[in-house]
Amino acid sequence: MKLSFITQAISSNSDQSSSIFKFNSISALSLIAAACILTPTAHADDKVVAGYFADWQYLNKDYPYTVDDIPADKLSHIIYAFLSMCGPHSGAGEPVQKQIKQQCADKEPYTAIIVDKEAALEVDFGDVNVDVAYKGHFAQLAQLKADNQNIKILPSFGGWTMSEPFHAMAKDPKAIAHFSKTAVELIQKYDFFDGIDLDWEYPGGGGLTTSPWNPDTKLTDEQKALEREAFTLLVKTIRSDLDALSKTTQRDYELSTAVGVGAKAAQIDWNAASPYLTNMFAMTYDFLGGWGTQTGHTTNLHATERSWWGMGADVFINQMIEQGIPNEKLVIGAAFYGRGWQGTKDFAGELPKGDLVSEQGAQFGTGENGYFMFWDLMNNYSSKQGYEYKYDEQAQAPYLWNPDKKVFISFEDQRSIKAKAEWAKKSDLGGIFTWELSGDPS
């Protein structure tokens, strides 16, 4: 994509709120736009433009995504999703549980592990010039690092389906120490990594195996307090081990964490934890989804009087700052996907209100019901298929509406991401990141 076209897209004042559904490439426009808005160069030290890389997306039959597809020259950080540790993973699918069992056969509990070793180390994605004893994504990342010295590459531990062992580990300081030690040893072995990212969903509960709505999984106040202290101990311990590694390698290492919004963020003692962290990635998406009938924007920048429960990225970000996260370390999240519903009631395509509901989440999507990758929306949900493109300027949020099928899809596009980047700059945030890069492979 030519830079002149990018510049034109950034500065364009054309009306994008019409029902004519015209997508531009998010990764080609918006992340570059974010880099242009937030910082004069893609790899400036002061601002983050990051993307999560999902290690399983190379298997996508429609749009396989590999390291070679990453726009490395436009990013400051690549975050590899996901690694884990030996421990309970009851929420993970059977194939993942099998992988973890294999990797942990000869390891102590809470040892840091590569879950999908085939993808990371064995699949042949092509020749590399770097001298490494492995293939897979890791070889490609080692080459990418050699070609882009200023970029930061971090492995992320946890994720929605693999956060259960964090809760078990939190009960034992020795387990925390062991995980930290082995995680740091892992990045020392695969030395293209520049630190560690944590995606514990969530300290204090609210994740897949700690739902507050289920009396069998809801954490007690005592357990929440323990995990609050454990998270601080965890980041303090990892920071200490990374600093020790720095003395050996003469390199600086980053430590970051993903942050849930609302009550989930409030469960962490940020005044105690944030000094040990380089960046905190605010998951300002999935405000709503097909798991409920409430319908509306899922990743809107601004809360409005029409927002369900007053939700908006700006509200959540400001809450995090009030809770002790330094604004310059806080990175706002953007989604390369959408969430959808069907049977939307009493709606004709106007701006969604805070009482909008549907019969259920969409019973179709990209690989899972109600979830739509951006490339899928771009290719299969246009005006040709009866979808009208709408834009809520007050919320800075696009959405699709199919009046015949009564389908509502909330998503992110270049306009809304540009708005987030501009707001992040105005608010002196640390930057912007996306989950996840393969959503727009163009």
Q: What are the roles of these predicted feature ranges?
A:
Residues 60, 90, 94-122, 204-372:
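Substrate-binding surface in catalytic domains of secreted glycosidases
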Residues 1-43:
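Gram-negative bacterial Sec-dependent N-terminal signal peptides
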Residues 45-187, 213-214:
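Glycan-recognition patch characteristic of GH18 chitinases/ENGases
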Residues 78, 155, 198, 238, ...:
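Conserved, mostly hydrophobic/aromatic
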Residues 53-55, 82, 155-159, 200-202, ...:
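A cross-domain feature marking catalytic cores of carbohydrate-active enzymes
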Residues 171-197, 234-241, 265-276:
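An active-site-proximal structural segment forming one wall of the substrate-binding cleft
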Residues 47, 75-76, 149-153, 192-194, ...:
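Short, well-ordered coil/turn segments that N-cap beta-strands
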Residues 58, 377-442:
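Extracellular low-complexity, Gly/Ser/Thr-rich intrinsically disordered linkers
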